[in-house]
Amino acid sequence: VAAPAEYTDWARRFLSSPGGLDHKWIAVQAGASDVMKAWRPQHFGVTLARFSKQWDGGILFIGSSSEQDTIDEVIRAYREAGGRSAIKNAAGHTTLAQLVALLADCRLLLTNDTGPMHLAVGVQTPVIDLSVGHVDFQETGPYGPGHWVMQPDLECAPCGFEQVCSHHA
């Protein structure tokens, strides 16, 4: 998969920093179509803060505008945990082609089981898939080499569709 040149140019302009400093970016998809498939926002925030202390790149939030409250929670937890990387928020502000171009420019996507995970695989951006709740990564991917899957080490994982996870990892 490749984005047309006009979208690649748009993505580079979107990700460019004031003062001409260009960051390396990781994309973060904190939402999911089902709350049971989503890692807790606080976990995202703390993980990103730890990551930012060892890496000088930026964090790009992607998703739909309906996920803005979740993103706000992640950013709040990120700042409380001492996160210091640059942040950009593209959630609700991209077309599909623009999202593909942004993902192609990122070094990594940290995500729940989502559609953008498969787009990132398509543009050869490495993925860390947080496979929680009723998600079975063997059925949903990410497919291909160079990606990582994190799933709770629980006897009951993955949960059934009708269950409410008592652990909600």
Which ranges hold each PLM region?
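Pocket-edge structural micro-motifs
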Residues: 30, 63, 91, 151-152
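Flexible, glycine-rich phosphate/dinucleotide-binding loops
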Residues: 35, 68-69, 96, 136-137, ...
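Mid-sequence helix-capping/hinge segment at a functional interface
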Residues: 1-36, 75
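Histidine-centered active-site/metal-ligand motif
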Residues: 29, 118, 147
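A short acidic, often aromatic-flanked loop/helix-cap motif at beta-alpha or helix-coil junctions
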Residues: 5, 95-98, 155-158
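Nucleotide-sugar donor-binding patch of glycosyltransferase catalytic domains
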Residues: 75-76, 86-90, 121-169
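Donor-binding and catalytic core of enzymes assembling or modifying cell-surface/extracellular glycoconjugates
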Residues: 40-133
